[in-house]
Amino acid sequence: MVNLLGEILLTVGALLFLFSFYEAYWTNLESNQLQHQAEDQMEQEWKNPRQKKNLELGEAFARMYIPAFGSDFQFAIVEGTTDDDLLRGPGRYVDTQMPGEPGNFAVAGHRVGKGAPFNDLGNLNACDAIVVETQNSWDIYRMLPTGDDRAAEAAACLSPEQVERVVAGDYSAVPGRMITLPGDVETINPIPGTTLAADPGMESLMTMTTCHPQFSNSHRMILHAMLVRSDPKTDGYTPPELESN
């Protein structure tokens, strides 16, 4: 009986090891290949002057950079948040806004395996930059305050008007980072935590969501950032946020 129990435990241990290997290594290889394919397709689309009507699920349409994570951090963002979409890279929630639009451009990404693009989101701080490159523009977002001195953190990177909205206005309840339950869908609304529809008078936000804690999907880590600048794409131009990286 003891020998049988030992064999069962060894078998279970081996299966867990194989599953961990699959999640942490093999899915990364698969995701990396799909990410490169999506990136290549996007580059071809950008070189084509014709404007596409609608994005297809899994199709890349933008590229994101987080300078705090180093110069090698860049991922093509795809349309959709299904398992297949997120295997290709970070995916846009299809009912949210596009980069630079008033409202909320919300993106989901894996934290473990499958490329793990959002593995280090917990290390970002207030005012850290998230740069989104589209076919025609560079959109620069800055992470919203995370500490107790909300006014000082906001003033370090936002305009005076944005500081007022973030400290005492309609964005005063929107944190830079929060932990919540998977069903908390209001975090990706045009103004997170409200049910307001997107409006031209709103700020342009970017929200990133991922599983929390690491190796678990019991909760979600949510990061909110606000657009501070949109630069048109011109030959040879790179935003200073990336040049200093």
What are these regions (language model features)?
Residues 3-4, 9-245:
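Solvent-exposed, non-transmembrane regions of membrane-associated and secreted proteins
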